[in-house]
Amino acid sequence: MASNLPVRSFSEVCCAEARAAIIQMENNPDETVCNRIWKIHRDLQSSDLTTTVQVMMVYRFISKRVPEGCFAILSGVNTGMYNPRELKRSYVQSLSSGTSCEFLRSLDKLAKNLLAVHVCSDVKMSLNKRQVIDFISGEEDPTLHTAEHLTSLALDDSPSAVVYSGWQQEAIKLHNTIRKIATMRPADCKAGKFYSDILSACDQTKELLDAFDQGKLAYDRDVVLIGWMDEIIKIFSKPDYLEAKGVSYQVLKNVSNKVALLRESI
């Protein structure tokens, strides 16, 4: 599906601070030129981590080379709360399952930048243009992301073109995201019940929404979605949650926090 969407240039989707450097590399992909641009940004103390990471990723894609000294940009950055190996493993798994866009959007900025550095430093890992676009594009414009994310704005296999308004739209996005991340649990995960409870809550919610759309329920979507949020909040308060470690813990925690904030706002 993603291949049917137009792939925009890197300079159209990157942050404003990285745009000039990325335009230079796009217009003149000569290795010497790109290498000079990368090293300037790598050593530029005034450049923030996100800007440098975006320049690094475009350099990696154009040159097909591991950026020299790429780990230097993490100097002084506290990344101890993340396990880079687990982070990259989950990303590779999301590529295989077609959920990489949702996975990246569920990470906070630091985790995403840390993952980018480790992806770019892996000589065995190739990057296509769509992957780089998904890493560097901003969250404010959903048209920059893959078709998988666009279709996640409504429940899968919905029997009609349902329009969700206000907070319902955000709740649906969170529902789809948390379900897809929960399906990516590691095979050796000890928190099996935790993940199963999440999937069960999401599946039951989809069934109820489908039934409502078909006129089989007397109550409305508000009741269904609020009930789902309450159930997710309850699941994350149980001891089983403590067994979810590594990137699964970080990602699901971020999404569950968004669920809790949305619930409080209603």
Swiss-Prot record:
Alphabetical keyword list: Viral matrix protein, Virion
A Gene Ontology molecular function term of the record: structural constituent of virion
Main localization of the protein described in the UniProt heading: virion
InterPro entries the UniProt entry points to: Mx/ML_C
Recorded GO CC terms: virion component
Location within or outside the cell: Virion
Function: plays a role in virion budding and release by presumably binding the ribonucleocapsid and the host membrane.
Protein's name according to its UniProt entry: Matrix protein
Organism: Thogoto virus (isolate SiAr 126) (Tho)
Species classification: Viruses, Riboviria, Orthornavirae, Negarnaviricota, Polyploviricotina
